[in-house]
Every structure is written in structure tokens, then in C-alpha cells.
Amino acid sequence: MPEGPEIRRAADNLEAAIKGKPLTDVWFAFPQLKSYQSRLIGQHVTHVETRGKALLTHFSNDLTLYSHNQLYGVWRVVDTGEEPQTTRVLRVKLQTADKTILLYSASDIEMLTPEQLTTHPFLQRVGHDVLDPNLTPEVVKERLLSPRFRNRQFAGLLLDQAFLAGLGNYLRVEILWQVGLTGNHKAKDLNAAQLDALAHALLDIPRLSYATRGQVDENKYHGALFRFKVFHRDGEPCERCGGIIEKTTLSSRPFYWCPGCQH
């Protein structure tokens, strides 16, 4: 399943295609959404927000389209009039004069009023989004030490969207390697330096992944690019200590770690 950085990049692509442009055609597959089709014609998308792995497409008439891709949903951007060759089932079409965005295969789709937006069960449940620029390491540290989360092993906590929205398995793996901890550690057992390092890594690594993953750095001395240090690298030497990276299963997900420097 895509994690927060991939969802945010998808939102960026949708915004770049249709933000601020009048909608010329709107289509929803689900009967309960059909009545909104005519209400959205002539309106425009003001912005696309991410809340962890959910997308909120906000319209100029104050309605918001909530969508969660789960495992199979995918958004695509096409030139208006183009019909992609795909076996996927179309769920949503938002068309402007030059670009159209299409949502395929997703089943968790709703239209929300401003009032419903504040009471939606999933949105009520998720924690702060790791890509929210207003989220600070100090707030993350407070959450780590809160009674709700301080006694939970990181193996499960870092996959729990109620803790921080947008984290997923590859981020869990890379964050714990970065700070030299294992999935069995708990926040209550960390010293001040470990806690501070973890709070920063929980924000820095997702943000670096969002900003640079998949890019090629032609200027070797300019900034840092995200790359996997341990994820999917079992059997290879750890670049930090030379130990051999291992693979196991934690919280029903593949987990990669270095026994030499994560303890």
C-alpha cells in the first residue's frame, strides 16, 4: 500500500492537473454520489489535502470528496477526451477543459459537507499527518510519551495511523534503522537522546522521501536524496556497521533490520 509520501505526490499531480479550473463534467459510479454530479459542474477544485493515506478533494462550493485507495485504488491524470486502456473499474471522473482526473478501483469514497468533515470516523481517528509542515518534533515527542502510546512496541505503533498518519512499512523500517532501535522497543524505555532522535526521524525521513524519492542527484554536493538503507536489502552489508541486514516479520509485515547496530 502506498505510504504518506506517495499519497502526497499523487495529490500534487491531481492539483497540478485541475486545481482552479472549472469542472466541465463530473461522474460518480456509486448511486449515493450521483446527485452531486450536477452540483459540481462549473465548480473547481480548490486544493487536495492528504490525511495519512486518505485524500480530501476540496471544491469551491465547500463540498469535499473523501477517498481512500486501500490496496487497489489508483488516481490517473489524462488529457480530456483520452480513455485509458485498463481493466480497472472507474469510480470517479472530474473533467476540466484540458485535463481529467480519474479514480479507479477504490471503494471507500464519500462526499462530505464541512460539518461531516469534522465528524468523519476515519478522519477523527487518524493522528497528525507526518507531512504536515506545522507538526514539530516536540509534538511528536509528546505523543510518544502520552499514556496512549508510551507502552506500545514500535513494531505496531509505527503502523498505527492513530499515532501518526502517513507512516507505513518502509518508513517504519527506515526510521528504526536510522535511530538504531528495534521493533521491540517502547517509548517509555528510551533515554532523552534516543527519544529526541526518534521524534526527529519520524518527521525527517517521510519528508525526505516525499521531496526526493526517485530523483537523481546530478549535483552530488547538494542536499540528501532518500534511498532505502535496509528495506528490501536483506543479506547485504549494513552501510553503518558492516553487519548483515536480516529480514523477519513484525506485526504481520516484513521487517528489515541490522542486528549489528539496532539493539
Swiss-Prot record:
Q: Which organism is it from?
A: Escherichia coli O127:H6 (strain E2348/69 / EPEC)
Active site: which residues? 2-3, 53, 253
Please identify the protein, giving its name as recorded. Endonuclease 8
The record's comment on protein family reads:
Belongs to the FPG family.
The record ties this protein, via PANTHER family, to: ENDONUCLEASE 8
Residues the record lists as binding DNA: 70, 125, 169
Renumbered zinc finger spans (FPG-type):
229-263
Which terms are listed as keywords in the entry?
DNA damage, DNA repair, DNA-binding, Glycosidase, Hydrolase, Lyase, Metal-binding, Multifunctional enzyme, Zinc, Zinc-finger
Which reaction is the catalytic activity of this chain?
A: 2'-deoxyribonucleotide-(2'-deoxyribose 5'-phosphate)-2'-deoxyribonucleotide-DNA = a 3'-end 2'-deoxyribonucleotide-(2,3-dehydro-2,3-deoxyribose 5'-phosphate)-DNA + a 5'-end 5'-phospho-2'-deoxyribonucleoside-DNA + H(+)
Chain's gene name: nei
Q: Which biological process, per GO, is one annotated for this protein?
A: base-excision repair
The stretch of residues making up the signal peptide is none
**Sorted alphabetically, which Pfam families does this protein's record hold?**
Fapy_DNA_glyco (PF01149), H2TH (PF06831), zf-FPG_IleRS (PF06827)
Co-factor note (free text): Binds 1 zinc ion per subunit.
